[in-house]
Amino acid sequence: MTTAKSGTTIEIIGAVVDVEFPRHAVPKVYDALQVDENNLTLEVQQQLGDGVVRTIAMGSTEGLKRDIAVKNTEKPIEVPVGKETLGRIMNVLGEPIDELGPINSKEKLPIHRPAPSFIEQSGTTELLETGIKVVDLLCPFAKGGKVGLFGGAGVGKTVNMMELIRNIAIEHSGYSVFAGVGERTREGNDFYHEMKESNVLDKVALVYGQMNEPPGNRLRVGLTGLTLAEAFRDEGRDVLLFIDNIFRYTLAGVEVSALLGRMPSAVGYQPTLAEEMGALQERITSTKKGSITSIQAVYVPADDLTDPSPATTFAHLDATVVLSRQIAERGIYPAIDPLDSTSRQLDPLIIGEEHYRVARGVQETLQRYEELKDIIAILGMDELSEDDKRAVRRARKIQRFLSQPFFVAEVFTGAPGKYVSLQDTIRGFKGIINGEYDELPEQAFYMVGSIEEAVEKAKSL
């Protein structure tokens, strides 16, 4: 029996479910449909005509049969927002998955919303200190900016992300939202306990749609996290939004696109790649009410930065932190590439003359060393001029001083984590490029915090 608001399933292929409605009551695209018998939510993706809509399931379609009643909720998926979500883990539908009872929020918001209009948006040039030397010096983050952590498999995107959350959440004392998009469940679990032990869990809302979830779930979980962040922003707060991993969002889009029968474009990606990325990224912005500072991990397939997925993401970011396998192989962590990473904030008008000069000096020294590497490999160090020898020695010290022990890696390394203030970072690197520490051995600069620690370490070597 079908009423005006209900339809029936007519075809099920994997995560795609076709539902037939009376012709005068066809659901709109992005409306949420409810299958009560299987407790399943479907999201309308296409209207096929004759009252039939094609939907993507937000959960498993196992056991779903034809001719089951489907109810139209007549609105998009809505999720709870506000302070009640802090310290809780939710799924894509905003349902708690931490077994701590229901989330009694006063308000629910749809996950599909237009981006703030041009007039509502606001820019800012205030810097966000992270306590990580290489980031603060060479690719500083802006409050209300967007940052991408680019890296291939196993170079430390998630560890860097967790360190940033720990440092910023503790020092910044604002609210954070973490969206786990298609990542490992183990990492989500580790992250939850890490937050609990650092006593910052009551300031973080967690939204997980991990690797084992169906593609529709992974495609929408980023929007769920974003909706929570937007709600905090519209209350007038400065909120942090962490997304791990934006590539899996694209990948879920590829799967959904293929299931819906669209013709793939370059490298097999969906033809709507740029539009899907824009729909998410354009909403991550600061308005006159408050700001969203977003830090996103971006997996780089086969370490190829020109792949359409990372290349599309680049266009939306204010700062890019590129993690390099070559640096990781040398045992320097965080394995951030000081020459490849960039930031729009690296401007003397924003960061000040001294910071700018030191950052450029560090990059020039490292660039000179890169250029001399071939000569050193063929002829050896002895063939270089005195100036070049000095540049190489300083560059090697800078490379080591760019490493730093992390708080979240204490368990593995046994070395206590270090938070280095921006002033200490600038002072340390300024000293190295000015030759104040030329007599210290290279090893003294490895895995220390401030320059004073390097001087202390040199005494024991």
From Swiss-Prot:
Keywords: ATP synthesis, ATP-binding, Cell inner membrane, Cell membrane, CF(1), Hydrogen ion transport, Ion transport, Membrane, Nucleotide-binding, Translocase, Transport. Coiled coil: none annotated. ATP binds at G151, G152, A153, G154, V155, G156, K157, T158. Produces ATP from ADP in the presence of a proton gradient across the membrane. The catalytic sites are hosted primarily by the beta subunits. Its EC number is 7.1.2.2. Its main location: membrane. The keyword Nuclease does not apply. It comes from the Bacteria. GO terms for molecular function: ATP binding; ATP hydrolysis activity; proton-transporting ATP synthase activity, rotational mechanism. One of its GO terms (cellular component) is proton-transporting ATP synthase complex. It catalyses: ATP + H2O + 4 H(+)(in) = ADP + phosphate + 5 H(+)(out). It is found in: Cell inner membrane. F-type ATPases have 2 components, CF(1) - the catalytic core - and CF(0) - the membrane proton channel. CF(1) has five subunits: alpha(3), beta(3), gamma(1), delta(1), epsilon(1). CF(0) has three main subunits: a(1), b(2) and c(9-12). The alpha and beta chains form an alternating ring which encloses part of the gamma chain. CF(1) is attached to CF(0) by a central stalk formed by the gamma and epsilon chains, while a peripheral stalk is formed by the delta and b chains. It is a peripheral membrane protein. This is ATP synthase subunit beta. Pfam families: ATP-synt_ab, ATP-synt_ab_N, ATP-synt_VA_C. CDD domains: ATP-synt_F1_beta_C, ATP-synt_F1_beta_N, F1-ATPase_beta_CD. Belongs to the ATPase alpha/beta chains family.
